[in-house]
Regions:
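Nucleic-acid enzyme cleavage-core boundary/entry regions
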Residues: 1-233, 242-358
Length: 358
């Protein structure tokens, strides 16, 4: 069904219609992007899925009779016993709850997180199936309604107040939206600024999501669920820096750490809307508003350029090479040099209207 022009000019929706049609055609071919060969690593890259664990990959062994493995073995058994009780009693606990059951034994939260991921991978089940949840940090706003697992009706709006991403994405039902696109915003500050500038109403109907930086599992699950349910165009708005690009890649292609859950988390159809490094020159953004790449930034950029999915994204590679050559990065806030509401009033509407994504 084609989108009816409401609010913004008809051409805006025509562009989205064309993009949506191409996405659906790609889906019928079996993926979110044109088919291309993947690279076999410990995690394999496939265009239609992202980074996923290869069958029969290298395994980590923990032996109960090995002095080096005693503590890890004990930690795994401890968490497995907690999971068993949770499943048996049909109750749930957060990762933080599990950490505080014996904080001295675990040492820190990261240890718990990694073991839970290992158990989920070992049993080949999503983390929610282990009855382990985590507090969502993401936010959502725009044209969206749904019912949570406990029956709570949630009605997101296009106003200045966002709704927290649900902690149990699998449990939400009766999802309703008329949105023409989904915009993923890297940073909370940018997300809030767009809400304050009435962007959602101006470009209505749409949905906006932010993971407040590196997205948590629930935010990624929500984006995936919205894509699977509605197949509307999904765009990302990130800083023109290596960190922002990596966050965008996590949404689109996933991460090595969660490659065993790639089918539930990745959205390869995601497009990069902005801020593009090429936009910096095109918009004549002054050099004194830019930030030099640090050595760490350059290492991160080199790392991303070597990843297998970059080979099937020549336009992304070109943008990253522009950044590498200039040795400069820019935050989205650099656009305020042009005007305080340039992002919401000019930049994003024009990008969406004229298909300025890659």
């Amino acid at each position: 069904m084609a989108f009816a022009p409401v609010g913004p000019e008809a051409s805006f929706f025509e562009v989205l219609d064309q993009h949506r049609a191409s996405l659906l055609a790609a889906l019928r071919r079996g993926g979110g992007e044109p088919a291309d060969g993947g690279t076999r690593l410990a995690s394999r890259f496939e265009d239609s899925v992202g980074l996923q664990m290869v069958p029969h990959c290298t395994r980590r062994k923990i032996k109960s009779d090995s002095p080096k493995s005693v503590k890890n073995f004990a930690l795994i058994l401890k968490i497995l016993s907690i999971i068993y009780k949770l499943v048996q009693s049909n109750t749930h606990a957060t990762k933080r709850d599990i950490y505080y059951t014996d904080s001295q034994l675990f040492g820190n939260q990261t240890v718990v997180d990694n073991i839970i991921n290992d158990i989920s991978c070992m049993l080949k089940v999503p983390r929610m199936s282990l009855h382990i949840s985590s507090t969502s940090k993401g936010l959502i706003a725009g044209n969206l309604r749904y019912i949570e697992e406990d029956g709570t009706k949630v009605h997101c709006t296009c106003g200045t107040t966002a709704v927290a991403v649900p902690s149990n994405i699998q449990g939400i039902r009766n999802i309703i939206t008329d949105a023409k696109f989904l915009l993923i915003v890297e940073k909370d500050a940018t997300f809030q600024r767009l809400l304050d500038d009435n962007f959602c109403n101006r470009m209505s109907p749409c949905i906006m999501v932010t993971g407040k930086g590196v997205p948590d599992l629930n935010t990624r699950l929500l984006v995936k669920k919205l894509w699977d349910t509605f197949h509307i165009p999904v765009f990302t708005l990130v800083d023109a820096d290596p960190h922002g690009i990596e966050i965008m890649c996590i949404y689109k292609y996933g991460s090595m750490a969660m490659s065993f859950e790639a089918h539930n988390l990745t959205v390869p159809a995601i497009r990069w809307l902005g801020l593009l490094p090429s936009d910096i020159k095109r918009l004549n953004i002054p050099r004194d508003t830019l930030i030099p790449l640090t050595k760490r930034d350059q290492m991160k950029l080199d790392s991303v350029l070597k990843r297998p999915y970059v080979t099937c994204q020549p336009f992304w590679r070109k943008e990253m090479e522009i950044m590498a050559d200039s040795k400069m990065k820019a935050e989205i806030q650099a656009l305020t040099f042009l005007s305080s509401d340039y992002l919401s009033r000019v930049y994003l509407p024009n990008k969406l209207k004229f298909g300025g994504w890659i």
